[in-house]
Design a protein with these regions (language model features):
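Early extracytoplasmic/lumenal segment of secretory-pathway proteins
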Residues: 29-95
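Periplasmic-binding protein-like
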Residues: 162-170, 197-202, 208-209, 240-264, 279-302
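A ligand-binding cleft/hinge motif common to bilobed small-molecule-binding domains
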Residues: 92-96, 220, 224-243
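An extracytoplasmic/periplasmic, membrane-proximal ligand-sensing/linker region
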Residues: 191-193, 293-345
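Extracytoplasmic ligand-binding site segments that recognize negatively charged/polar headgroups
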Residues: 38, 42-45, 68, 82-223
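Short beta-strand->loop
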Residues: 103-112, 127-128, 156, 242-254, ...
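A bilobed periplasmic-binding-protein/Venus flytrap-type ligand-binding module shared by bacterial periplasmic
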Residues: 138-143, 256-268, 287-288
Length: 345
């Protein structure tokens, strides 16, 4: 009687072992996708967790840096792409890649539900929009008055010599916020007048940072009196108790849109399409709304406390495709004139 029981136990154990071995390849088949992004560092963890919970067969490997660095990297890798997906990069950069035939056409599932302005006009689509962010002025209401520096209301005000060495803004070659600001000035003022304005502004700049968030943080701390920076960072600093006013310049607010796209040549197309699908889901837009006041899903109004009212009405009229196409020319001129005051990298 003992032998049959033993034989049954051995067979059962063997079956379990075989099942375990069969399960290993299934786990090993998880696809790893390389995602290039300029998202804020505190965003990528929640985005990865939400995507992988919905898609357990795909794992995201982030490559994160500032907009300028990621844009330059994608362009440098044009003939040998390393990224599978771009998720969270300025749409002006993504539009540039599109014009160079670097994106894989794909209309994500559910893309018809998002706002028309947040969709590529191509069919199939080449990219989809996530959210929009604006450039604002963050003015320290405690320290600046001590130095007899009045609260500005316009971009033109920043050329006033009273602000000498008191202003900080992002380097447009590094920061998307910086580039959208310089580009918008050219649209608002005209090219000649804009460069003349920037010559005067340069005299008042203490440093050009490599981050769109840093200027409002520095203004919030009283290290600089005025920061030209990312709208949501200003709102967060003010909500945390910083003595700053967040100002939309009366000439209009520079802006760009974050976008998602699949890189042409990806070896993981099916997995990349899952990222693109997730990026236009309602759940994804709820995540975007935790960091941005303007998102691409209808009916969502995620503006946080202390965010400037009617900000979307202040957005400067721009052509994202032209903004991308003019990038190299504008940055070359800006670097030649002003890069000497850039912070060390």
């Amino acid at each position: 009687m003992f032998k049959p029981k033993l034989r049954g136990w051995v067979l059962g154990a063997a079956a379990l072992a075989v099942s375990a071995l069969l399960a290993v390849p299934a786990y090993a088949q998880k696809t790893r996708v390389t995602v290039y992004s300029a998202l804020e560092s505190d965003q990528i963890g929640p985005y990865k967790a939400a995507f992988e919970a919905a898609n357990p067969d795909v794992e995201i490997a982030w490559v994160r840096d500032s907009t300028g660095v990621i844009t330059a990297r994608v362009l440098a890798e044009k003939d040998n792409p390393r990224a599978d997906v771009i998720w969270g990069l300025g749409a002006s950069s993504v539009a540039l890649f599109d014009s160079m035939d670097m994106l894989q056409p794909y209309t994500p599932k559910g893309a018809d539900q998002i706002k028309p302005a947040f969709r590529s006009t191509k069919n199939p689509m080449s990219w989809t929009g996530m959210d929009a962010w604006l450039a604002v002025m963050c003015y320290n209401t405690v320290e600046a008055p001590k130095k007899n520096m009045p609260k500005p209301t316009s971009w033109a005000d920043l050329a006033n010599p009273v602000y000498k060495d008191a202003i900080v803004m992002p380097n447009p070659a590094s920061s998307g916020t910086g580039y959208q600001t310089v580009y918008a000035w050219i649209q608002i003022m005209g090219e000649k007048a804009a460069w003349e304005f920037m010559d005067k502004l340069h005299n008042n700049i203490a440093v050009y940072t490599h981050s769109g968030s840093a200027p409002c943080v520095q203004a919030a701390k009283g290290e600089r009196m005025i920061g030209i920076g990312f709208d949501m960072r200003g709102a967060r600093e003010k909500t945390a108790g910083a003595p700053i006013d967040i100002i939309l310049a009366k000439e209009g607010a520079p802006w760009d849109m974050e976008a998602t796209a699949i890189v042409k040549g990806t070896k993981n197309l099916a997995a990349a399409q899952k990222v693109a699908d997730f990026a236009v889901s309602k759940g994804a837009y709820e995540l975007y709304g935790k960091s941005y006041a303007i998102v691409g899903y209808p009916g969502m109004n995620p503006a946080p406390p202390n965010y400037p009212p009617s900000a979307d009405a202040a957005m400067v009229k721009i052509d994202l495709s032209k903004m991308g196409a003019d990038r190299a020319k504008i940055l070359a001129e800006w670097t030649k004139r002003y890069d000497g005051k850039s912070a060390p990298k």
